[in-house]
Amino acid sequence: MDMNTILLVYLGISFTHLSFRSEGYQFLGDLTKVLLMPTLMLFLMQQGNYPLLLAALLFATIADALLNKGHQGSHFFWGMASFAVCHIFYGIHVLSLGVDWILTAIAFAGLMIPYSLLYRLIGKQKGAAKYLAYAMLLFMLASLLTGLASLLCIMGIVLFIISDTMIGLDSLEIRHISNTSEMGSYILAQLLLVLGFTAL
């Protein structure tokens, strides 16, 4: 199976998943969700040697399976922990490529503005520390990707932040956002990140 075919399969699974979610077919939606990242892993293996990216997508798959259980409780905690490991592997891969540290520092300083707003919004809520720690990790990865100067990767991490913000708002019961919106952002985020990394 060539790489273009694999990408078409990914897009097909994505469309099918979003359709199942929008129609309320929970089991089929859960099933197609856990097929997404393994499909991108096949694409990566066709592209070359990317062990860190494969590890990242493996933990993303674990996170997807755990978050099928919802945005509360121990499954949610371990799901987000798995995503944190995913981001760490992404970050290590970025560092192995080399970044512009000036761009990285500028991006990090800029991202501290929304981070401070997040702290003011949820800082006093019970269990806020884990959300704030996760957000810091995500913003650090976003800063590194800015230093990498890959437009695809930057677009990908922005969509990842949007998706995770939706999940966080739902988990904290601040605002419920449709699962299709959250997953649509996430599906495109992971695709853009993988395409960005393999284009470097």
Where are these regions (language model features)?
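Polytopic alpha-helical membrane-helix bundles and their juxtamembrane interface segments
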Residues: 1-200
